[in-house]
Amino acid sequence: MFIAYLTAGAPDLNTTKQALLNLANDGADVIEIGVPYSDPLADGMILQKASQQALKNRFRLEQLWHLLAEIELPVPVVILAYYNQIFHYGVEKWVTTLVNLKVKALIVPDLPYEEAAILRAACARHHLHMIWLISPTTPKVRAKQLALACDDWIYLVSRTGVTGVDAHFDNQIPNMIAELKQVTTTPIALGFGIHQKQQLQLVKSWGADGVIIGTACMQILLEKGVDQLTEWISAMKKSSYP
């Protein structure tokens, strides 16, 4: 399972549209779209820059909704947003909007499971899946709880800290994958810092079912453009997760 991440509206909406279409048809099994935010706590410098660029261009949520309504992607779409964005938009309205746009799942990186009762209930009512992040610092009991709460796939964070192209993986990751597979059959995708083919092969050897590539995608898109990103993603996927 190869999951590609894009920040909506960075560097502009037309580029986002073309990148979504290209990746969905030539590489990605799932596309995760990040909603630009002024204070993205989980994001490293590159994704922060992407958000800032989109916001500087006066990005509005309605533009993303219109884009998703306009194009039909042949792969599942996951939206990543911070809870403040959802709260101000309206929880029920947010969930129903995503469902009407055929979005498959939602990730809210700054919302603890225990504080998400209202959002979880709304998602359950409207059959919108939720994906939770598990990190190397997550206690084992809690990690199992979160794994069982994930509907589509489990987002396993490769290390503590923020996103970025740091190649370091926490040494607990192989054991965490093995332990999670003992309690659930939900696919496990590893994210944060993945940008090299040898990393994909290593992650696959640990038993992970997929990878999430975000920072590297946005770095290539911002610096080299859509065509280079498409070629790179296609080559990366073929190397380990064809």
Swiss-Prot record:
CDD domains: Tryptophan_synthase_alpha. It comes from the Eukaryota. It catalyses: (1S,2R)-1-C-(indol-3-yl)glycerol 3-phosphate + L-serine = D-glyceraldehyde 3-phosphate + L-tryptophan + H2O. Gene3D superfamilies: Aldolase class I. It is an enzyme of class 4 (lyase). GO terms for molecular function: tryptophan synthase activity. Keywords: Amino-acid biosynthesis, Aromatic amino acid biosynthesis, Chloroplast, Lyase, Plastid, Tryptophan biosynthesis. GO terms for cellular component: chloroplast; cytosol. The active site is at E32, D43. It is found in: Plastid, Chloroplast. InterPro entries: Aldolase_TIM, RibuloseP-bd_barrel, Trp_synthase_alpha_AS, Trp_synthase_suA. Its EC number is 4.2.1.20. Pathway: Amino-acid biosynthesis; L-tryptophan biosynthesis; L-tryptophan from chorismate: step 5/5. Pfam families: Trp_syntA. Belongs to the TrpA family. Tetramer of two alpha and two beta chains. The alpha subunit is responsible for the aldol cleavage of indoleglycerol phosphate to indole and glyceraldehyde 3-phosphate. This is Tryptophan synthase alpha chain. It comes from Cyanidium caldarium (Red alga).
